[in-house]
Amino acid sequence: MKIILSNRKPSESNHIWVSDISSIDLFVDDSESTEIIIDSMLTSFPYIELGSVLSKTVSKLRVNGRIIIYEKDIDMICHHYNKMGMGVQDINDLLFDTSGSIASVLNIETIVDRLKELGLTIEEQFINSETMQSIITARRSNNEN
């Protein structure tokens, strides 16, 4: 079973769309999903809740299942604002374009650290400098904490 967590309806037809993470238990049991995609949804939670949100999501992954996270990177946004002449309107467009309400900002290191704390193996991490989006792929192994 493949899941996509997103505020906007995805074009992926082979994934089950969950638009409200609090309802994920209705769609998938623990250790059932082979792949979970989180598309610009983590910032809709307060920063202090990031660990618990990721923990609940990761609990839905099978052993060897993977999670892919797309999230705007605040470090890259600040860099563009400072060095590239990005304006305040540009930042507002980036942060509030499709994410709905925003309760926190994140960078790639924060997300990677939380995933590692949950016992996941990071397979890939990079920042798309054009979209200023962190892209992280991690896998749940069978030797978790």
Regions from the PLM with identified roles:
Residues 46-47:
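Helix-capping/helix-break motifs at membrane-protein junctions
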Residues 34-41, 50-53:
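A short beta-strand submotif of the Rossmann-like class I SAM-dependent methyltransferase core
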Residues 24-38:
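A short acidic, Gly/Pro-enriched loop at the edge of an enzyme's catalytic core
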Residues 33-35, 60, 71, 114:
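Functionally constrained cores in energy, signaling, and assembly domains
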